[in-house]
């Protein structure tokens, strides 16, 4: 007998394989995992038949296990499918313990609007260009919701802008250095989703000790905070703070501390002669805050 139900839904131009693998990595123990395959070709056509298929599977599964709590993970369009399903089934809301969106264009896909600017019905573009922010905000009042977005630059994951993924009432996490498909393979995304599904309360990180450690590095010089866009994620703290780097063996190596609201709290750099000192400081932080970090160890 499973302890809970975890539905996972793939998105546009995809099948269920990768999100099923992700679900296996992040699911709570003894969870029953359901990852319907909607078919690659069908994801290019209309969203309503896809919603109907997933709704049928969910209805049957929830009826079979009427007392089990329910969680959902949806990647991109998969998250939109579940926003529609849950909006139509408020009787399921009391059973929902977590709804995780991975790069879902809740406010509408800008590429879809470009492909179908008049809303004439050009394939799936019409359906993905619609804003579902109002529906998502109503759901967020009834259940815990997490929106994880990738960021290759400060605008988004090369497919979905950051501003399209956020809405009132959600927990908003941006994972730097991850593009749209990479949300399904990132160990840091896995860790954030696993932490949320387990309903753990993140402990806040006082940034001052971290900043003091970085400032104490030999040769550290104040840098340009705007440069953190496109930097590599090194450490992700459970409260959303992230330590990012731009590393170079021949010029300057930059380090940034960014908070959960995407504000850069520290920016600095060292020259090649002090590069080793910087990486030793990062290793020290990794050890000191090991119990507050999400994601893989090197």
Residue ranges and their predicted role:
Residues 1-5:
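A short, charged/proline- and glycine-enriched loop
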Residues 140-298:
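C-terminal catalytic-base region of ester-bond hydrolases, centering on the histidine
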Residues 6-12, 16-17, 21, 26-27, ...:
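Serine-dependent carboxylesterase/thioesterase catalytic core
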